[in-house]
Amino acid sequence: MVRFKKSIFSLVGALFILGACSSNSASPESEPADEGEKESKETYTIGVTQLMEHPALNLATEGFQKAIEEAGIDVEYDMQNAQGDNSANDTIASNFVGQNVDLIFANSTPSAQAALSKTTDIPIVFTSVVDPVGAELIESMEKPGGNVTGTSHHHPDSIPKALEYLKNELGAKKVGTVYNAGEQNSRAQIDKIKKQMDEYGLELIEATVSTSADVKQATESIADQVDAFYCITDNTVVSAFESVADVATTAKVPLLAADLDSVPRGAFAAFGVDFFEVGHGAGEMAVKILKGEAKPADIPAEPPKTLKFMVNKKVADTIEVEIKPDWEAEIYE
C-alpha cells in the first residue's frame, strides 16, 4: 500500500515537472519558484501490525493514530491484520523490515513478539499487551532496553477487583473462563487469577479453545457448572464474544468481562480500561521516537492509569441481577 502511494506521487510529480519545463520555455521571464515552496515535509512510514479484528484492538489502533495526528507528524501507514494467524504475524513483520519502515506499531502480544523476532534495529511500540516483561518484549517496565517500548492494557487492580466482586457481590463460588492456552497474553492472566483464587474462596472452571469457532461450544460445556463467567482479554475469545454472551445470558449466568468494550456486546459487567487511551499512550511514545526526542530503550513502558466499572442494564434485567447504587458503576443502556 505504501509503495503504491509513493509510485502515484512520483508520477504526478514527474508530470508537474514536465509541465513546468514547458511553461518556462514559453515564458523565459517567469519568476523562479520560491525556495520555501521546494521544501517538502518529511513523511514517516509506520507499519501497523494487529493480530485480529475486534473492538478493543481496533480502538487501540485508533487511539495510536489520533496521538500521531495531534502531533502534526506526516505519516503513511501500512495497515496489516494477521486475522489471528501467527504465521501471518511473522510474514507481516518480515515485510516491514524489508520495507525499512521508520517504526512498527504492534497491537497485541503475538504481533509484538513477531516484530521483535525480525528486527532489533527498527523501533517497535506495542500496545494491548498484558505482561510485556513475561512476554520477553522488554527487560523491565521502567527500563525497557533494546528497540521496544509500549503500553500494557492490564491494570494491576483489575483481577483483584473482579474476584472480589464475583465473590462478595454476586455470591459466586465457581467461576468459569474460556481462553486460548496458546496465547501468552492469556496464560499470564490465568496464572494471576489462579494465584488469587484461594484468597477469595473461588474455584476456577476452565475451558480452552484454539480458534474463535470453538468458543461457543467451549462456553456451553461448562455453563451448567458455574455460578458466573469471567472473560479475560483473550484475543481469540473476545473476537467471538457474542457467543460467550449468548450462552451466559440464556443460562442466566452473570458474565463479567475484563474490557469495557465487551459490555455493549453482551457482558453483564466489566472491570476494564479504555483501549483508545491505552493506544493513545503508545502513540505519544511513537511521536517522541520519530521526533528523535527519545529512544525506545529509554521510554518506560506504561500500564493503564484508570480502571472503570461498567454494567449493562439490559443484561442485568434479563438475568435478574439488581444493580446496586454502591457499585458506583457506569451504566450502559
PLM features: residue spans?
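Flexible loop/hinge segments that line or gate small-molecule binding clefts
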Residues: 114, 119-157, 257-269
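Hydrophobic alpha-helical segments within soluble ligand-binding/sensing domains
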Residues: 132-174, 274-294
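Structural motif
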Residues: 76-98, 208-222
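Bacterial lipoprotein signal-peptidase II cleavage site
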Residues: 19-38
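An alpha-beta-alpha
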Residues: 46, 64, 149-200, 300-315
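Hinge/cleft segment of the Venus flytrap/periplasmic-binding protein
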Residues: 288-333
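Beta-alpha junction/loop-to-helix N-cap segments that form part of ligand/metal-binding clefts
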Residues: 81-139, 234-249, 253
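Extracytoplasmic "Venus flytrap"
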Residues: 32, 37-65, 71, 78-87, ...
